[in-house]
Amino acid sequence: MATIPTLKTDRLCLRQFQSSDAPEVQRLAGVKEVAAGTFLPHPYPDGTAEQWIASQQEEFDADTLVNFAIVLLAHDILIGLIGLAIVAEHEHARMSYWLGMPYWNHGYATEAVQAVLAYGFNQRELHRIYAPHFLSNPASGRVLQKVGMTYEGRMREHYRRFGKFVEVELYGILEQDFHR
């Protein structure tokens, strides 16, 4: 059984989720504004975070998913999640992330995305990483632009969220472009 690595940036530690993180995951993810920009359920059911955290090592061992807890280094406070859903056969991954509302607009998402791109290309030897975001969440699009990802298009009414079809914008980056 391999261990989910720990990544560090200037302000963040990206580490494996621990069972003790469950209450904070539930608190942060349970905010409707956070759920609206993600696929998190709302309301966030009791017990969901515990079950989800318990499944993470198995997914990592299957080489299909790696999720990191985003933690503020200075205060050891969990602020969100970032992960890669990996398709090993095609050497690509879908990146997803979310932050608790108090941590929006501080550059944390950009810092975490940059670290996970480096991990994906340098350690996992991926060829491509892409990230969709809901059109209604333009801040995520700005994060992806800042790290050098290329806008690849819009998928109209691609997902159903809170009873409505929503549009998704897609960004991607190739390994060779990341290392330029």
For each of these PLM feature ranges, what is it?
Residues M1-A35, N67, V71-R180:
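Acyl-donor (CoA/ACP) binding surface of acyl/acetyltransferases
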Residues A29, T38, F60-D61:
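Hydrophobic residues in alpha-helical segments
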Residues E33-S55, V66:
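Conserved GNAT-fold acetyl-CoA-binding loop/helix
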Residues S55, E59, Y119:
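Solvent-exposed, charged/polar functional surfaces in cytosolic regulatory/catalytic domains
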Residues E58-D63, M149:
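Short loop/turn motifs at secondary-structure junctions and domain boundaries
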